[in-house]
Amino acid sequence: MYAIVRSGGRQHKVAVGDIVEVDKISTAQVGDTVELSTLLVVDGDAVTSDPWVLAGIKVQAEVVDHHKGAKIDILRYKNKTGYRRRQGHRQQYTAIKVTEIPTAAK
């Protein structure tokens, strides 16, 4: 059984017990439980994608860690003018562990 969930403008395929990195959830502390909105639930041969049914289904996950991703370097350069700009960025992530995927009511 797995589900497709939406978090931070991205979609993730998750199953119970998976640890997934999502964009930082600033309101959640380590150990808190968060709910993720569901776009699709697959349970064996049963596929649920109806938005009216999925509106009541929320995937439960536990916050495991907050951390930063790898640093990326942004360089801008224009030849013959001496124009150079350097910038770095580290995206902040939240690691969550999926604890429950409820099934659709039949």
From Swiss-Prot:
Q: List the disulfide bonds.
A: none
Q: Which organism is it from?
A: Streptomyces avermitilis (strain ATCC 31267 / DSM 46492 / JCM 5070 / NBRC 14893 / NCIMB 12804 / NRRL 8165 / MA-4680)
Q: Which GO terms describe its cellular component?
A: cytoplasm; ribonucleoprotein complex; ribosome
Q: Name one GO biological process term.
A: translation
What domain of life is recorded for the organism?
Bacteria
PANTHER family in the record, alphabetically? 50S RIBOSOMAL PROTEIN L21, LARGE RIBOSOMAL SUBUNIT PROTEIN BL21M
Q: What does this protein do?
A: This protein binds to 23S rRNA in the presence of protein L20.
* GO MF terms held by the record: rRNA binding; structural constituent of ribosome
Q: What is the protein name given in its UniProt record?
A: Large ribosomal subunit protein bL21
How does it associate, per the subunit comment?
A: Part of the 50S ribosomal subunit. Contacts protein L20.
- Tell me its family: Belongs to the bacterial ribosomal protein bL21 family.
Q: Give the record's keywords alphabetically.
A: Ribonucleoprotein, Ribosomal protein, RNA-binding, rRNA-binding
Q: What HAMAP family does the database record attribute to this sequence?
A: Ribosomal_bL21 (MF_01363)
